[in-house]
Amino acid sequence: EIMPSLVGSEMCIRDSTQIRLGYGGKPFTIYKFRSMQQSTAPDDAKWTSENDTRITRVGHILRLTHLDELPQLLNIFMGEMSFVGPRPERPTVYDDLDGKVENFRSRMQVMPGLTGYAQVNGGYDLNPAEKLKYDLIYINHCSVLFDLWCLLKTIPVVFTMKGAR
């Protein structure tokens, strides 16, 4: 009974992997459960919007509960991500924001995270410049206590489904 579930889960993860930029700009494959319809352009960097028609019914539930991020524990165990840090972005996002948001690439000074200071202070509701502001605060005050604080602040975000799309 478990085997078909594991195979199905593995296929959902494998089919929805993307390249992101991590610490120092190093590319890595990020793992996620598929929550959107597969795009014809696999690296299509459109931002997700509220009531986005590309999000599937199951994907909506995964995103509301943040379970679509669960496979990123693999990235953490492989040393590509941390529990706390700026969220990793696609290379095309960095290319698009170069020159538009000053110092956006400075986010790559630390390991990207599953959650971050920007996520507990607005997440999807923040524009890239606002996210960068919070990411820079995190980078400049990075500590074990700050990480613990961010993790504790993440709990109500997950359970209240705040900031989910």
Regions found by a protein language model. Name each.
Residues T48-M111, C150-V158:
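A short, structured surface patch at a secondary-structure boundary
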Residues E1-I13:
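Single conserved hydrophobic/aromatic residue that forms the stacking wall/gate
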Residues E10, D68-Q72, D135, D147:
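Acidic active-site catalytic centers that drive phospho-/nucleotidyl reactions
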Residues T17-R54, L114-K133:
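Short, glycine-rich, amphipathic interfacial segments at transmembrane boundaries or analogous
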Residues S9, T40, E80-M81, Y124, ...:
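A general structural signal marking secondary-structure boundaries and capping sites
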Residues M3, G85, N140:
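Small/polar loops that bind or transfer phosphate-bearing groups
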Residues N103-R165:
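C-terminal terminal-structure detector
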